[in-house]
Amino acid sequence: MASKLLRAVILGPPGSGKGTVCQRIAQNFGLQHLSSGHFLRENIKANTEVGDMAKQYIEKGLLVPDHVITRLMLLELENRRGEHWLLDGFPRTLVQAEALDRLCDLDLVITLNIPFETLKDRLSRRWIHPPSGRVYNLDFNPPHVHGMDDVTGEPLVQQEDDKPEAVAARLRQYKDVAKPVIELYKSRGVLHQFSGTETNKIWPYVYTLFSNKITPVQSKEAY
């Protein structure tokens, strides 16, 4: 195992397969997969101060502002100073990236570039189990029973912003907000971009990249 703690971030638009790639990285390299969405749900559920602040925005259908999500994530990262980790969903904006700079230096930033039309198709086929955050896709990750969560058997829902008419606007917004973040990490020489439509084809390159930074915990690539 490398003596230096690995600090990595994964960027990508909604529907890019970030969650799947994160799971594989965590499984193969023993990194903690730290998801901003997961921490938001946990803090809202626990009625923490920052969770209550975030809830006020979410209930109004608003984006959680930079200062709230940054406070939440920096608190979580402070508690994990001794761990290798992979950040997913943070930083989303330049303000968030600059706040993260004050805590640590990043070793790797990977961004997934997926064609616009592919993302639109994927998102409109996406259904979720809100209590857990589990995501299903009717094409490549369908539930065992149509419309039902595999673990609990509870009904799945399609988010309003996953409906086709909302998807294009979300993708445009992501592109506008993410561009300066991507440029920042590119200028520092830590950005690695992966393009394609299938996670299984991108994965070997991601595996090789991480293998050069940290010793895999498994002897072969886990799919």
Swiss-Prot record:
InterPro entries in the cross-refs: Adenyl_kin_sub, Adenylat/UMP-CMP_kin, Adenylat_kinase_CS, Adenylate_kinase_lid-dom, ADK_active_lid_dom_sf, AK3/Ak4_mitochondrial, AK4_mitochondrial, P-loop_NTPase
Gene, per the UniProt record: AK4
Places the protein is found: Mitochondrion matrix
NCBIfam families tied to this protein: adk (TIGR01351)
Family (UniProt): Belongs to the adenylate kinase family. AK3 subfamily.
Domain free text: Consists of three domains, a large central CORE domain and two small peripheral domains, NMPbind and LID, which undergo movements during catalysis. The LID domain closes over the site of phosphoryl transfer upon GTP/ATP binding. Assembling and dissambling the active center during each catalytic cycle provides an effective means to prevent GTP/ATP hydrolysis.
Keyword GTP-binding: yes
Name of the protein this chain belongs to: Adenylate kinase 4, mitochondrial
Gene Ontology MF term list: adenylate kinase activity; ATP binding; CMP kinase activity; dCMP kinase activity; deoxyadenylate kinase activity; GTP binding; nucleoside diphosphate kinase activity; nucleoside triphosphate adenylate kinase activity
Stretch list, region NMP: 35-64
Amino-acid positions noted as binding AMP in the UniProt annotation, renumbered to this chain: 36, 41, 62-64, 89-92, 96, 170
Keyword Hydrolase applies: no
Enzyme Commission number(s): 2.7.4.4, 2.7.4.6
Modified residues (N6-acetyllysine): 175, 179, 186
Oligomeric and partner information: Monomer. Interacts with SLC25A5/ANT2.
GO annotation terms (biological process): ADP biosynthetic process; AMP metabolic process; ATP metabolic process; cellular response to hypoxia; GTP metabolic process; nucleoside triphosphate biosynthetic process; regulation of oxidative phosphorylation; ribonucleoside diphosphate biosynthetic process
Binding locations of a ribonucleoside 5'-triphosphate: 15-20, 126, 135-136, 199
